A protein has these predicted regions:
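Juxtamembrane membrane-interface segments at transmembrane alpha-helix termini
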Residues: 145-154
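Membrane-helix and juxtamembrane interface regions of eukaryotic multi-pass membrane proteins
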Residues: 1-139, 153-243
Length: 243
């Protein structure tokens, strides 16, 4: 692929697939949310269809992230030599799996939770209610292309370019608006629909909704804090660099 090494091609291809899926999810979310005037009763065929499409993607993405980790470790020189015994290769693969789970444990747990819990909750337990809210949830993927582009730029040591800085600003804005504010907005939208105080929504919302928000929202806050910390470090390095 364009003369790239296998590892580089695999990593960039994985980021590209993630970005394409994110654009599709965001587009589906916009269509669904804009089509539902009644946030609870209105339905759109794209809701269940995209849930069926996106769920296998999250399962695939666990493997794709491992593939990226595996190639990064090989580049760093942690792979076994080509001529060594098969047992050594097995040990190398096992070490890569353990290292991957340690490094990406939160992301893996996030994806497993989406597949094991959010899929049945979205497709079965909600019983056709709340397509609007499902569409808004799809909009969380709007920040993913910026995440992927940032990782590719860092991979190719382009983190000092203007493109990386602009992408960082876009990432901060999209992640904050589409992920950090996501769950508060969902509760706010339901409070307006039901004409009840915002603090009363958790008391009447289905337990599946409360559990999903309780587990997923803290992850978004944590990842946003990491993004802000990275942005501050970049700004500090730029301020301390000689003119």
């Amino acid at each position: 692929m364009m003369g790239w090494r296998e590892g580089d091609a695999a990593v960039v291809s994985t980021r590209l697939v993630s970005s394409v899926q994110a654009v599709m999810a965001s587009s589906a979310g916009c269509i669904i949310a804009s089509s539902c005037r009644d946030v609870m009763e209105d339905r759109h065929w794209l809701t269940d269809a995209y849930i069926m499409f996106a769920t296998p993607y999250f399962a695939y993405d666990i493997y794709a992230m491992f593939l990226c980790h595996w190639h990064k470790q090989r580049v760093k020189g942690h792979e076994e030599e080509e001529g060594e015994e098969e047992l050594g290769g097995v040990r190398s693969l096992g070490a890569a799996v353990v290292g991957y789970l340690r490094r990406e444990v939160l992301m893996v747990l996030h994806h497993v939770f989406v597949v094991a819990f959010c899929f049945p909750a979205s497709l079965l337990w909600r019983q056709g209610k709340g397509d609007y809210f499902q569409g808004v949830l799809f909009l969380a993927e709007l920040s993913t292309p910026s995440v992927c582009l940032g990782k590719v730029l860092i991979q190719y040591k382009k983190h000092h370019t203007l493109l990386h800085k602009v992408n960082g600003v876009v990432l901060l804005l999209t992640f904050f608006s589409c992920r950090v504010l996501l769950f508060p907005y969902l509760y706010y939208a339901y409070s307006r629909y039901a004409s009840i105080p915002l603090y009363s929504v958790p008391l009447v919302a289905p337990w599946q909704c409360n559990l999903g928000a309780a587990l997923l929202w803290p992850l978004q806050l944590y990842w946003f804090a990491l993004i802000c910390r990275g942005a501050l470090r970049l700004f500090a390095r730029r301020s301390n660099s000689p003119p």
